[in-house]
């Protein structure tokens, strides 16, 4: 995955996720750094300079996945007939699962509702395992 810096200030992209830890060190505007994820799973990605910069990467081991359209609809094509567990994830909602049976006809409708009412921002530690310095009111981004 490539992490491009198009901002007029430096970044330091890192993750302390168990099986996919990495640190791209500090890099400036116009630079791009890359990382190859070794294991499937959720990777929380942060910037060691900007505590509110957060990204989530779902590393998948198979080909049966998708990202929904802006209206929430999604399609996963070319699924062989059989029984499957659909897993739906969003950073602000608990994961939702549905058992799905795909027939030879293919098309299956599934309704999924995510509930983000319990979401709370939780501060994370920097790449050294320490709190970020308090700069409230001094941010320039």
Whereabouts are the PLM-identified features?
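Extracytoplasmic copper-binding redox domains, predominantly the cupredoxin/blue-copper superfamily
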Residues: 1-141
